[in-house]
């Protein structure tokens, strides 16, 4: 299940993911307007959901209540490009309150990691009185390089993976967790990481000559993925279009 409204780059990635999954699984597409999810579906995969309606969130909720498994790739932030510049914009999935109900908070911040992958990006360079813009392959702190030493901690989930690059990620945490469910984090950055609400993702080597971006004095491992398992309480007191949706 992916949003009908997504960038061409994301659409390409979703198509690649679908192609790989089709080698082993039967794939069923669901529209954003879906109000009922067949219980025969083994796994509901939500890729970059965007502005889901209350009816759709209710369908997801009831699928989970019926014992279904749900995997969500989501962030409160999105990346957009204009000309040669890239920037961060807000992203609303429609699942924010539903996730909080289950104790999952995705912070409105970006994670940076000194252990990162490279990224070709336009960089301004001064030559005498002139400034030129050229594309350089730089170590990009927002492209978090997760290696086998981290992945092996959750080998049942990450089996066969030796490396993952997690791009423009936000911190994920557990708050006010429902006591009937258990959680474990399965994906994290290195200990040389930090998060910030500074969303300038264009490097400035004139101001920050080391890596092109400001760093934090305090660095620590940051969680990027979590698994919840067990019994869940519905977010809804009643079906949509009726009063009193429980947002606690």
What are the residue ranges of the model-derived segments?
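Acidic, S/T/G-rich, low-cysteine, solvent-exposed domains in lumenal/extracellular/periplasmic regions
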Residues: 4-248
């Amino acid at each position: 299940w992916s949003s009908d409204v997504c960038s061409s780059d994301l659409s390409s990635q979703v198509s690649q993911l679908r192609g790989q999954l089709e080698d082993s699984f039967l794939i069923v597409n669901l529209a954003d307007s879906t109000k009922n999810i067949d219980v025969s579906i083994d796994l509901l995969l939500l890729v970059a959901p965007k502005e889901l309606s209350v009816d759709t969130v209710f369908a997801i909720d009831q699928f989970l209540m019926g014992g279904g498994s749900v995997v969500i790739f989501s962030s409160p932030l999105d990346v957009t490009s204009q000309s040669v510049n890239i920037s961060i914009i807000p992203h609303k999935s429609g699942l924010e309150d539903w996730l909080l109900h289950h104790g999952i908070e995705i912070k409105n911040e970006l994670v940076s990691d000194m252990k990162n992958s490279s990224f070709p990006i336009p960089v301004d360079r001064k030559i005498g009185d002139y400034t030129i813009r050229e594309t350089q392959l730089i170590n990009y702190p927002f492209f978090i390089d997760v290696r086998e030493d981290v992945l092996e901690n959750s080998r049942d989930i990450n089996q066969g993976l030796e490396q993952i690059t997690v791009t423009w990620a936000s911190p994920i945490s557990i708050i006010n967790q429902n006591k009937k469910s258990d959680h474990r984090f399965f994906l994290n950055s290195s200990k040389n990481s930090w998060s910030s609400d500074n969303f300038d993702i264009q490097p400035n080597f004139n101001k920050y000559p080391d890596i092109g971006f400001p760093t934090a004095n305090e660095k620590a491992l940051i969680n990027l993925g979590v698994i919840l398992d067990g019994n869940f309480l519905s977010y809804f007191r009643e079906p949509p279009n009726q009063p009193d949706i429980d947002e606690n």
